[in-house]
């Protein structure tokens, strides 16, 4: 990964790791038991063949606690989409989330990358996977889906042409193409995952896109997605895109569906 993204991901990951290591010292983690359905869903996902062990998806030992935190069948995921998209650093997540990430990359992320840059995504930078903690770092509130390996925070994308797109820089201050790419990836995530949060949703998600599979919005449809984005970005504006610290000049669109 490029130096800028590497420093970003490493720096933010250190903070996330500290939370994961020490977040369970107090809070609502040591009472109750992990819901049995979680382990059953993990097992069904693996036995159903949604995800297979490989050089980039490695089974790990069961994570049992502290408290309700953990996974029955955790995976160390260093690559997605048949290994064509590197995950940096490798993520500790469950099978259901791994399968959903594969689908999202195939149906939303790669088509958007080809459409706006004529290049495919080869790496995503994540800053939080499994971690025993509460939502938004509040250990006395509701337990985060990160505590069950059922969530991932994505901070950056790297393309095959060398371009790096970080959520922190490009969401608000990126070129029209960068913003359109992130909007398309975000909108696609809202169809694939149950909870999706990005910059503008609250002060905790200013630098990443959070995705998880917890059904939190059953009364109003199954998906909770914030912020709500306006549809479309006029690509005519992209001809004069200014250079940013996270971008190179976009290439003409040559991906699937090009005329």
Specify the residue positions occupied by each region the protein language model found:
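Short, intrinsically disordered, charge-biased short linear motifs at domain edges
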Residues: 9-14, 28-34, 54-56, 210-212
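Catalytic cores and adjacent binding grooves of peptidoglycan-active enzymes
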Residues: 27-31, 60, 64-67, 75, ...
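Sec-dependent bacterial lipoprotein signal peptides
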Residues: 1-24
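Active-site-adjacent substructure of cysteine-protease-like catalytic cores
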Residues: 115-149
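Active-site acidic/histidine clusters and adjacent loop/turn architecture
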Residues: 37, 44-125
């Amino acid at each position: 990964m490029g130096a800028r993204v590497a420093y970003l991901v490493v720096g933010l990951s250190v903070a996330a790791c500290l939370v994961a290591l020490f977040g369970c010292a107090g809070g609502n983690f040591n009472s109750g038991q992990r819901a049995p359905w979680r382990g059953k869903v993990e097992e069904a996902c693996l036995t159903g063949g949604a995800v297979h062990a490989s050089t980039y998806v490695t089974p790990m030992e069961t994570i049992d606690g502290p408290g309700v935190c953990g996974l029955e069948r955790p995976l160390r995921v260093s690559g997605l989409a048949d290994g064509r998209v590197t995950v940096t650093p490798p993520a500790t997540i469950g099978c259901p989330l791994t399968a959903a990430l594969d689908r999202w990359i195939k149906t939303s992320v790669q088509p958007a990358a080809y459409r706006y840059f004529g290049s495919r995504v080869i790496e995503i930078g994540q800053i939080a996977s499994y971690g025993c903690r509460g939502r938004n770092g509040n250990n006395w509130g509701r337990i985060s889906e990160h505590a069950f390996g059922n969530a991932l925070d994505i901070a950056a994308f790297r393309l095959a042409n060398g371009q790096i797109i970080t959520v922190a820089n490009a969401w608000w201050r990126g070129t029209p193409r960068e913003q359109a790419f992130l909007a398309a990836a975000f909108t696609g995530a809202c169809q694939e995952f149950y909870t999706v949060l990005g910059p503008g949703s609250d002060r905790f998600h200013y630098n990443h896109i959070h995705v998880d599979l917890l059904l939190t919005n059953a009364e109003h449809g199954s998906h909770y997605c914030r912020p709500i984005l306006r549809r479309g970005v006029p690509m005519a504006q992209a001809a004069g895109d200014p250079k940013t610290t996270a971008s190179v000049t976009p290439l003409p669109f040559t991906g699937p569906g090009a005329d």
